[in-house]
Amino acid sequence: MWEGDAEIYELAAAIQATSVELERWLFDNMNIPAVLAYLAATVVINDNDHIAKNYYLYRDSDGDREWEMLPWDKDLTLGRNFDPAGGGVLNDHIWVDQDPQSHPFVGDRNHITNASVWNRLIDAFYRVPRIQEMFLRHLRTVMDDALQSPQTPASELKFEARVDELVTQCLPELQLDQAKWGIPDYGDTSMDYAQAVAILKSEYFAKRRIHLYETHGAAGSGLIPNAQEFPYVSLGQI
């Protein structure tokens, strides 16, 4: 079924509003939980490449008629980023704690990428105080569930465990690939896959935890809240 483009023009116009009008439109027309989940995930993996492109904007026209953002193209994540100073995407630089590019609000007008772009929809979400608070609370939940704090024992780290699983699964193919094609001829040409995995763990995951939990946590900038205690509910007792 063919649909026109009136709704996308409506969205583009609506997110230019301010204050109560903007808040009302976002709550009425956006799938708030889905968008917040999407944004929190991009912060954990430090995705700078989804700001001006590399995402789908989907409207459930036959259902709740709400918009949400869907991910696409995640090669420049987990520390990888476009480097305008040289090399483009072919560089070994790890982006993990350099603000504004590594800030939790990257993508709004005050936290642009190193390609000097920002996203008006993301900016609209963060300009509404209630939605911003919801985002930061959800970000903390995702951090605790997936990234985990810097104090987490190494044996309990989920990201690192998953990386190790993938290395074990892919190693035979990786060895064949490197034997045939060698190591890419940019950056550190001596870096093999094992070294790259070690860098991912020590230079991205470890430092990302510090940046989000400490630099921007309650004891740092105060932006990201502390974890909330789950209330104890006893059913069947009064």
Predicted regions and their residues:
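Middle-to-C-terminal accessory/interaction subdomains
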Residues: 1-52, 58-238
